[in-house]
Amino acid sequence: MKYEDIRRQVLTAIRQASAQGLIHGTSGNISVRDREAGVAAITPSGRPYDTMEPGDIAIVTLEGEWVDGPYAPSSEPPMHTAVYRARPDVGAVVHNHALFCTVMAMAVDELPPSTPPQAEFAPIRVVPFAVPGSRALAASVAAALGTDGLAVLLRNHGSLCCGAAAYVEEAAQVAYYASALGRFTPLGEADIRACKEMLAAGRAV
């Protein structure tokens, strides 16, 4: 089987995301890049994740062209591959419709971190709604991530992460509940920088 390693990585990641409650049914999509081959493995469209096999995972070029696999890729290769083209450092992309990210994407223009582990993802910007799978959505996501961003929220849609998606959903959940209680206190800029430095040095926060 061609591209077996990245296909298996995608399958493992999508099952973990499903177990964490970040993905339901066949919603959401995950991709992993093969830098040497210049392709990415991405979840296929409409296939149940619990019965999926590595060979079911679609392969696309970094321009989004489907080149291998028995099932068509998710509708979102333009968004995934736009991130890969803009960010050579990114090796995997997770897009989901997790509840709290989706809710907060409709309520705020930026989601600030409120705990040390969330600092790694700051700032988490919110991009305007665009039709899923469109070039407009792909372009706005790549622009919002910039040169070092790790996550964005998609208004009326969900989120996209280049890292541990569970922390982004946690950030949205904490912000939602704290706001509901009447006082949401995010980390300050100096604290965010300090936490990022600790994380970059491999120190747990």
Each PLM stretch: what is its role?
Residues M1-V205:
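Glycine-rich flexible loops
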